[in-house]
Amino acid sequence: MKINQVVLIRHGQSEWNTLNKFTGWHDAELDKKGKDEAKFAAILLKKEKFFFDCAHTSLLKRAIHTLQYILDELNQTWLSVKKSWRLNERHYGALEGLNKDEVIEKYGQKQVLLWRRSFDISPPQINIKDKRFPGNDPRYSHLNIHDIPLGESLEKTAKRVIPYWNKIVYPELKNNKKILIVAHGNSLRALIQHLYKIDNKAILDLNIPTAQPIILDFDNEKNPIKWHYLT
């Protein structure tokens, strides 16, 4: 692994991915395929002799467990891991827990695609009395209630992801650390869009597959150059 690279990985397939549900901040488990995907991602990394100094993930177990499977395969289970809500999947608001096909049937393919892929359009929001409100979960008890999302667009997701990159991850990169980030489709989309200046229309077409390592390349000044999938 080169010192000017960062590896991003979306978690393996979850039980709610299989059920075709909007997952968001719901803490879905990896299914068997997702566990196998995580192990295969690690095999790809091992084949290319990747070795990490730092690892980051979200507070959701589908990402945490994916990272654990990868570190186990790489014989790096001892590695210190930083976990942050800022790397969580986007919050899908009132869509969380609903079947995607049923939502399409109700609202139409075009509207659902805008909710899922556009930059600045949020899904319908929940309220703080909704059982899905993350403020009911002790893992978010340290957050100001006004920081807890009720439903996010990609733009809102980016507003929490990018500060984490700037304040936590980028200083590690500047210090030539080899970094692995295991997170979620939309938190990673937000980061890639920010780093590689993808316009708001083009980001509609970016869909990140489960457990497919993404290699971010940086120049010697730690400016992003290009990104590609490891296959």
Curated annotation (Swiss-Prot):
InterPro entries: His_Pase_superF_clade-1 (IPR013078), His_PPase_superfam (IPR029033), PG/BPGM_mutase_AS (IPR001345), Phosphogly_mut1 (IPR005952). SUPFAM superfamilies: Phosphoglycerate mutase-like. It holds the Pfam family His_Phos_1. Substrate binds at residues 10-17, 23-24, 62, 89-92, 100, 116-117, 185-186. GO terms for molecular function: phosphoglycerate mutase activity. It is an enzyme of class 5 (isomerase). The record marks 184 as: Transition state stabilizer. Keywords: Gluconeogenesis, Glycolysis, Isomerase. The active site is at residues 11, 89. The keyword Isomerase applies. Pathway: Carbohydrate degradation; glycolysis; pyruvate from D-glyceraldehyde 3-phosphate: step 3/5. It catalyses: (2R)-2-phosphoglycerate = (2R)-3-phosphoglycerate. Its EC number is 5.4.2.11. Belongs to the phosphoglycerate mutase family. BPG-dependent PGAM subfamily. NCBIfam families: pgm_1, PRK14115.1. Catalyzes the interconversion of 2-phosphoglycerate and 3-phosphoglycerate. Homodimer. This is 2,3-bisphosphoglycerate-dependent phosphoglycerate mutase.
